[in-house]
Amino acid sequence: MELAKSFEPAAIEARRYPEWESRGYFDAGLDTSNPNAFCILLPPPNVTGTLHMGHGFNQTIMDALTRYHRMRGDNTLWQPGTDHAGIATQIVVERQLDAQGVSRHDLGREKFLEKVWEWKEYSGGTITRQMRRLGTSPDWKRERFTMDEGLSKTVTETFVRLYNEGLIYRGKRLVNWDPKLGTAVSDLEVVSEEEDGKLYHILYPFSDGPVGDLRGLTVATTRPETLLGDVAVMVHPEDERYAHLIGKTVALPLTGRHIPIIADDYVDREFGTGCVKVTPAHDFNDYAVGQRHQLDMIVVLKLDGSVPAVAERYTTDGQPREGVAMPAGVAGLDRVPARDKVVAELEALGLMLEIKAHKLQVPRGDRTNVVIEPMLTDQWFVAMSKPGADGKSITAKALEVVASGEIKFYPENWVNTYNQWLNNIQDWCISRQLWWGHRIPAWYDDEGRIYVAANEEAALHAWKADLEAEIARLQGEVQSRQSQGQTAEQYPDLAERLSVLHARYEEGTLRQEEDVLDTWYSSALWPFSTLDWTPEWPQKSNPALDLYLPSTVLVTGFDIIFFWVARMVMMTKHITGKIPFKHVYVHGLIRDAEGQKMSKSKGNVLDPIDLIDGIGIDELVQKRTFGLMNPKQAQSIEKKTRKEFPEGIPAFGTDALRFTFASLASPGRDIKFDLARCEGYRNFCNKLWNATRFVLMNCEGQDCGMDPHEPGTCVPGGYLDFSFADRWIVSRLQRTEAEVAAQFEAYRFDLVARAVYEFVWDEYCDWYLELAKVQIQTGTPEQQRATRRTLLRVLETVLRLAHPLIPFITEELWETVAPLAGRKDADSIMLARYPQADMGRIDEASEAQVAELKALIYACRNLRGEMNISPAQRLPLVAAGNAELLGRYAPYLAGLAKLSEVEIVAEIGADELAPVAVAGETRLMLKVEIDIAAERERLTKEIARLEGEVAKAEGKLGNASFVDRAPAAVVQQERDRLAGFKATLEQLRPQLAKLAGR
């Protein structure tokens, strides 16, 4: 097949990917006789989502690992799938309905869910189509969705089991509440940013009048409207100012209630007045204080964020008490107008002592931008710290498997984050007040009793069994009464109760829980639910589970170590007894070139598909300004975008983008994405393409030394006469193969990319191809044959080595190169064996010779530069040194240093006017006529310029302000410049001195 003149990625990508997929190259290996297994789980992206740079980055890493292990011959599974993304998906569909003037409540639950499933079918394939564009190779035949029948069954089975073990319970606790969505939300869905607010200083008068000079306690708060739910004022137990007041009460303004003054270590004595209001139903810290002090909880906001006429009141353990009437002027108001009303009334009473401007962290819903309210509601929870039947909590087990090294983090420092979160864990709220998601498998009877079961039939069965037991007990009591001679008129309540129970039994209905499970619950089961887990495993064999649980590595961002990683460890270990994965590779978050987070509101989002295909500036502006939460930002975003990308974004192709992602995968929290890197790696792909064209032009139709031959014939004059340059590139290849393998094992994909890049660009293309040209032009037939063989064999190996990072170009080139290189063992590079270093082929002598040759060539090039001689002008070289070595190097020197001839002499006279370069034991001089006056003038000017540069650099580096304040890299750059200027001066001054007397 003839290779195109230039690399055209779009055409290659469109052709190659369908070939790979249709031929089953991505299918999971299920060879149980092969003990080597590699499995990686795709963190399931939202089904309604689109590919963003973070997806592109971690999927490149996952695919590189998958291709690497597949080529090593391991059983390999990359498990793909998508997440139903409860809140995100429901919001999308509700917005669509809203545009039609319809609400989900107008449709009803069943009809609304039909609409969501329609949307899922329509939109769900977007992200997997985009993954294909990235060249990813998961086993698409095993693609899963978190609400598939099998996964949903696993969700139900685990919920029932945990409930029966006492590890799932229903309770009234404080949660993050989004009043607009009307549901509890996770911490990950809450964004806290600093905003301008106010700090209100309110006087709480003592119930029994002033105490000394004090009328009461002054409390500072940013939420005066929650004053209505206060149940105490707390001070620090060691605060001498208030020690004598502990145990007294204050009159709570506007309410007519009196609340105690309590002592608690939570109080910061240095902040404000040192007095803090306690509102357990509306603040997470206050909730904890309330639990410690057995304080009631008064809920002064309804779920929509408005103040009720009568606030619900609960004991510490969530039992209802008599409600608390709210002030008439405040009841019915939303929380913000309620705040204004409370402030006005406090001012009228003279109790508002001061209002100050104040910066505060305001929690807002990441999807609604509405202020999140800590809300006391009935929710379902997983008990994170409660010991199970084995005496250990699920959190303790999750900590143990990391502490023991059974699960390892890369980089290791993320263990601290994992431990910190788990050591400060709270029970996990797993219920959401949504319609889209896994409906909680719990049913209620008319008296509020809960029945958790796999299905309604099982719940009814349990309920009827309870009813039958109660009926039997009551009937036994009736019989006992009758045996004592009592008649029905004497136990009417008992008869009435029996009548009610019989009626209910005949009716036989239960009400299912309306809430659905938190999306993270089903995500926590992902490591085993996707492998078709059943409770019978491992007693009942399952090849996928047997081979791939635990999986090898999880690739994830640091932001979800707690929300996803830790929960997978807990749930998988508790349910299956196995860890979910052996390694956790934690990467940073992709940011723009300036280190800013990519976000719609900042207008700096990049779509990886746009980097692959390119996009015009007008279309890019339209994408960035469409659908903004704040349309006023459109103008500034457009201006910034047009300045940054005046011509739009060029097409880089998938391979260049993947190589860029891999090169950026260094340890750290932030990854700055610079488009210039993409351009550099596109150039790399072009260089690899052109190098292959060169090799093919010199090898196709030629004797490339691929015929069978005896090992002893690879000697001078034999069938293959390998030069020191041939042995050098093979030796360097072994070192590169070893480095790549080591860095893949260490999850240092940046170093994998660097090793491949430096070998291909710096050693194979820049040096070996040039050396090979000389050998093909000047060598014997045996040397030419050996050179062609080396060109092909090294190139073919390089293509396999680079394939996990840049799959498309390597497949395209390998198809042509492999047959010429004598490889006929695979139909695709994907199925070819990954290169493994043969350390016995490292040739240090040849490496030393090439290093010496390079030094000579650099010296010749430097001489040209010093004398301002055009690179195109061929000149003779005079060389003094080891005549045998120089004779061997002469053809290469002539070819690579653009010399007309190389004259080897015993020594170069001291009276020669031309500059002489020294490289090791060799002295080199270009034979050129010197215009003494002109050269003297040139050297004088150049020395003066360099002395000026030295003075400037020394002045900068002598300035303490520059050295202390400039970035370290800038200071080092200045030091390097100074060293370079001085080194050049050391070369030029002797040359000028030589000319001085002429």
Swiss-Prot record:
GO terms for molecular function: aminoacyl-tRNA deacylase activity; ATP binding; valine-tRNA ligase activity. A motif ('KMSKS' region) lies at residues 597-601. A motif ('HIGH' region) lies at residues 45-55. Keywords: Aminoacyl-tRNA synthetase, ATP-binding, Coiled coil, Cytoplasm, Ligase, Nucleotide-binding, Protein biosynthesis. The keyword Nucleotide-binding applies. Disulfide bonds: none annotated. It is an enzyme of class 6 (ligase). One of its GO terms (cellular component) is cytosol. ATP binds at residue 600. It catalyses: tRNA(Val) + L-valine + ATP = L-valyl-tRNA(Val) + AMP + diphosphate. It comes from the Bacteria. It is found in: Cytoplasm. InterPro entries: aa-tRNA-synth_I_CS, aa-tRNA-synth_Ia, Anticodon_Ia_Val, M/V/L/I-tRNA-synth_anticd-bd, Rossmann-like_a/b/a_fold, tRNA-bd_arm, tRNAsynth_Ia_anticodon-bd, Val-tRNA_synth_C_sf. Residues 455-486, 929-989 form a coiled coil. GO terms for biological process: valyl-tRNA aminoacylation. Its EC number is 6.1.1.9. Pfam families: Anticodon_1, tRNA-synt_1, Val_tRNA-synt_C. Monomer. NCBIfam families: PRK05729.1, valS. Belongs to the class-I aminoacyl-tRNA synthetase family. ValS type 1 subfamily. ValRS has two distinct active sites: one for aminoacylation and one for editing. The misactivated threonine is translocated from the active site to the editing site. Catalyzes the attachment of valine to tRNA(Val). As ValRS can inadvertently accommodate and process structurally similar amino acids such as threonine, to avoid such errors, it has a 'posttransfer' editing activity that hydrolyzes mischarged Thr-tRNA(Val) in a tRNA-dependent manner. This is Valine--tRNA ligase. It comes from Azoarcus sp. (strain BH72). The lineage of its organism: Bacteria, Pseudomonadati, Pseudomonadota, Betaproteobacteria, Rhodocyclales.
